[in-house]
A protein has these predicted regions:
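Redox-cofactor-proximal catalytic regions of oxidoreductases
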Residues: 58-87
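Flavin (primarily FAD) cofactor-binding/catalytic cores of flavoenzymes
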Residues: 2-56, 61-64, 69, 93-382
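Glycine-/proline-rich flexible loop or hinge segments
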Residues: 86-94
Length: 382
């Protein structure tokens, strides 16, 4: 199956016709690749039984867009994809390697080894219910599918909260997604907003190049040492409970309630960088202002306020509850309760790399069983 970008003159005909396929996997990051791998293991063939569509221009998921100074030593652990170790591709002495180079190299090798035939760049614009099938509209044409594994992650949906005066600020407002290097801020005062791991990492870098102010909504709590596997399992269980109730999963920081007190964080504290201030009440033309009238001049406001799940293309399916969450079911909470033909892998408890691996397997098995799909060799011998 060859998928090409639709030319403008063919869009009207594309609206009438759709390529029929059993399953569409949307996204080719950790969650999407894991799901595709497990579909293959179950005997289903890419480009015949399922297709994998990825919006990114190259393998690597969101990792290919991360800032250059983010190395394998400073990221949360990158877990192996099923069937292929990470160190097979990047080696065991790779802490100083850029994450934006190493992980894409690993994903590319993985796609090739298992012949997953990812189609890119293909952007899914909308998914609609067409009775027994789901219509998946993309900028490369339409697909008619019996089921969907959605693995679109969060990178394309940065979250910036609304604050009074934001539209009149004369400086720059950026998000974590926009960050490249601290050198870009030399000679400027940067307000870093956010209390998560990314906020701490960027505050560390930027504060070594220029002056900073750090503000958070909640008082940050630090805990000794890195997070343990047991602690991680408790957090995953907490998030799983939320999504099974139809509640929004929340950010990692909001669920962990604390940040690891690493050597780098201790060094920041010794430098006086962790002088956290509460959230300001408004943004002015030249900076920020708190409720008591105190002002801080700023050239840049860097919003390290996280991301939201990239699910806008699923809006016509009306999967959300009144509170904004999606009620999930299934063994690992990947199946959408309102429409069991849809699995969200990388949402809620499967948002971590290790969670995505396990969830990809569960989604592949549960979805093919629900749709009563049989591998080609079984169909041909029946």
């Amino acid at each position: 199956m060859t998928i090409e970008q639709s030319a403008p003159e063919s869009q009207s005909s594309a609206a009438r016709f759709a390529v029929k396929v059993d399953l569409v996997v949307i996204g080719a990051g950790q969650a999407g690749l894991s799901s595709a791998y497990h579909l293959r293991r179950l005997g289903f063939e890419p480009d015949r039984d399922f297709v994998v569509l990825d919006q990114a221009p190259a393998p690597g998921g969101a990792w290919q867009f991360r800032w250059p100074s983010l190395t394998l030593a400073t990221v949360n652990r990158v877990h192996d994809l099923p069937g292929m170790r990470f160190d097979e591709i990047v080696g065991t002495e790779s802490d100083t390697v850029q994450a934006s180079a190493a992980v894409p190299r690993y994903y590319a090798a993985y796609e090739e080894r298992y012949d997953l035939r990812v189609h890119r760049p293909v952007k899914v614009s909308v998914v609609c219910d067409r009775g027994e099938r789901l219509r998946v509209e993309t900028d490369a044409g339409a697909f008619s599918a019996r089921g969907i594994v959605n693995a679109t992650g969060t990178w394309e949906t940065p979250y910036i909260p609304e604050y009074p005066g934001a539209d009149r600020f004369r400086g720059r407002q950026l998000h974590t997604k926009d960050y490249r290097t601290a050198d870009a801020f030399r000679g400027q005062h940067v307000v870093v907003v956010g209390g998560g791991i990314s906020a701490i990492q960027l505050l560390d870098e930027i504060s070594q190049a220029t002056t900073t102010t750090w503000v958070t909504r909640r008082e940050p709590q630090f805990r000794e040492g890195p997070f343990t596997e047991e602690f991680g399992r408790r957090i995953v269980a907490m998030v799983e409970d939320k999504v099974r109730q139809g509640l929004p999963p929340g950010s990692v920081a909001s669920n962990t309630g604390s940040l690891p007190l690493t050597p780098a964080v201790r060094a920041m504290r010794d430098r006086g960088v962790l002088n956290r201030l509460p959230m300001f009440s408004e943004i002015t033309e030249t900076g920020i202002r708190w409720a008591d009238g105190t002002e801080q001049r700023a050239d840049v406001i860097l919003w390290c306020t996280g991301f939201r799940s990239s699910l806008d293309h699923l809006a016509p399916l009306q999967l959300r509850e009144e509170g904004g969450g999606i009620t999930m079911t299934g063994r690992l909470a990947t199946q959408v309760a309102r429409d069991p033909r849809i699995h969200l892998v990388g949402y809620g408890p499967s948002a971590s790399t290790i969670g995505a691996n396990r969830a990809g397997g569960a989604a592949a098995r549960e979805l093919t069983q629900y749709l009563e799909m049989s591998p080609a060799e079984v169909r041909s011998s029946g």
